[in-house]
Amino acid sequence: MDIEEKKSLTSSWFRELRDMFCEEFVDIDGGSFERKNWDHKFEGGGEMSLMKGDVFEKVGVNISTVSGKFDNDFKSEVKGTEQAPNYWASGISLVAHMQSPKVPAFHFNTRYIVTGDSVSYTHLTLPTKRIV
């Protein structure tokens, strides 16, 4: 599988995860998500999915797929960008705040980042079964 196939598979997988998470939150709460698209200043963008409900004060399930160039201050911190500062990234972020102050909030995110050095990575394994 070449890097372009991996990027496409990754973006699709994050969209599927977003849809699964949103479905589970709706099943629990009965509310509905509002979606809003946003654009990245270079290329790409994302979609915010927000819900306010009875169980959850606020839930956000956000996905993004963006590309661009790291600035000079940051590119020295990221492997593979010293010679070519280009990047491509896709990810998902989830934040949930409950109505009850006795139930803690939670947050997680994960990203798949491609840099000039990424072509040396040959394995990308994504789950094939529903994990929620």
Task: Describe the role of every protein-language-model region.
Residues 2-79:
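Gly/Pro-rich turn-and-neighbor structural signature
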Residues 47-121:
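Internal mixed beta-strand/loop scaffold within catalytic domains of large alpha/beta enzymes
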Residues 122-128:
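Conserved small/polar residues in nucleotide/adenosyl-binding loops
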